[in-house]
Amino acid sequence: MSMQDPVADMLTRIRNGQLANKYSVKMPSSKLKKSIIQLLKEEGYIKDYNVTGDTKLELEVFLKYFQGKSVVDMIQRISRPSLRIYKNKNNLPKVMSGLGIAVISTSKGVMTDRMARQEGLGGEVICYVA
C-alpha cells in the first residue's frame, strides 16, 4: 500500500521518536522532506541529518534534546492532501506569537514564515514547529 501523506509520516516519526527519547529516526527520503529537515536543522530543532542508501534513499534524522527534554514541543501538519492551506504574504501565520516557526512552501523553495515575510512571498503552509 502506498503512503498517502509522506510529510505527515515524517513529522509523526519525529514526534514519536522524541516521545520515546530515541537518538535518531529513519524514514524514506525525498527532496521535500530533505528541504524541511534542512530548515529544522538551521532553526535548531534537530541536531543533524544523513541521507544514505544506494537504490532506496533513506533519511536519518538525529533528534535534539536539552536537559533531557525534547527541543520540539509541538510539531503539527497543517496543509494536507485532502485540504491544502495557502496563505498570501499578508496572512502568513505566526506560531506561538513568533516563538515557533511555520514551514511554508513558496515559489522560491521551502522557508520559514519569517523568511517568507522578508521575501514578500506567500505559499502553502506545510506545518508548525515550536
Curated annotation (Swiss-Prot):
Disulfide bridge partners, by residue number: none
Keyword field: Ribonucleoprotein, Ribosomal protein, RNA-binding, rRNA-binding
Cellular component GO terms held in the UniProt record: ribonucleoprotein complex; ribosome
Domain of life where this protein originates: Bacteria
Presence of the UniProt keyword RNA-binding in the record: yes
Gene3D superfamilies: 3.30.1370.30, 3.30.1490.10
BP terms from Gene Ontology: translation
SUPFAM superfamilies assigned to the protein according to its UniProt record, in alphabetical order: Ribosomal protein S8
Pfam families associated with the record: Ribosomal_S8 (PF00410)
Keyword field contains RNA-binding: yes
InterPro entries tied to this protein: Ribosomal_uS8 (IPR000630), Ribosomal_uS8_CS (IPR047863), Ribosomal_uS8_sf (IPR035987)
Example of a GO MF term: rRNA binding
Quaternary context: Part of the 30S ribosomal subunit. Contacts proteins S5 and S12.
Function, as annotated: One of the primary rRNA binding proteins, it binds directly to 16S rRNA central domain where it helps coordinate assembly of the platform of the 30S subunit.
Similarity field: Belongs to the universal ribosomal protein uS8 family.
Name of protein: Small ribosomal subunit protein uS8
